[in-house]
Amino acid sequence: MEKVKKIVLIGASGFVGSALLNEALNRGFEVTAVVRNPEKIKIENENLKVVKADVAVLDEVADVCKGADAVVSAFNPGWNNPDIYDETIKVYLTIIDGVKKAGVNRFLMVGGAGSLFIAPGLRLMDSGEGPENRLPGVKALGEFYLNFLKKEKEIDWVFFSPAADMRPGVRTGRYRLGKDDMIVDIVGNSHISVEDYAAAMIDELEYPKHHQERFTIGY
């Protein structure tokens, strides 16, 4: 398999997207950063190209993804968006179709923790835990993964679920990876820094170990 060099990063100016952008550039990837507001990206780097595009439009997604070795998406319509549930699912279906239309095979998605199991048969999003105002967005990511992405056979996708609590912190490089069960520490907390999450995602980009499946991270 040829090494991934050129990537498209959707949602590159957001909380997770900006961490992914920094990690990818620091590791020498050529990045096309796809954003709604290009002025939000202040980085200057010879390997960075910033493109304004509406990822809810199929042809715009396909055009911007053409020629890439892989597409990474950190798209989020905004936690305060009243239509976050519908928009998340609708736009991600468009992104997947655009990636296919562009002829790109590898797709890595910033997932949510909601679809992780916290006990046998019980997913976080069905447990009543977590802030209620975030539930529509959490459920949208979880249901997109369970109802759509898991059935996707045409492209080599990955859905990378963070720990339940992901915050700005430091890049330690010391974390654990898992599959469908939430990873918790010795006192039962599920947490990760966004910097370590980004490092693990770019590791997966550079050294693929997961194919058409979800994986997760935690300390």
How would you label these PLM feature ranges?
Residues 146-168:
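Conserved beta-loop-beta element that borders a ligand/cofactor-binding pocket
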Residues 80, 114-119, 165-169:
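Conserved catalytic-site region of short-chain dehydrogenase/reductase
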Residues 7-27:
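N-terminal Rossmann NAD(P)H-binding glycine-rich loop of SDR-like oxidoreductase domains
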Residues 153-154, 167-174, 204-213:
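Glycine/proline-rich active-site loop of Rossmann-fold NAD(P)-dependent oxidoreductases
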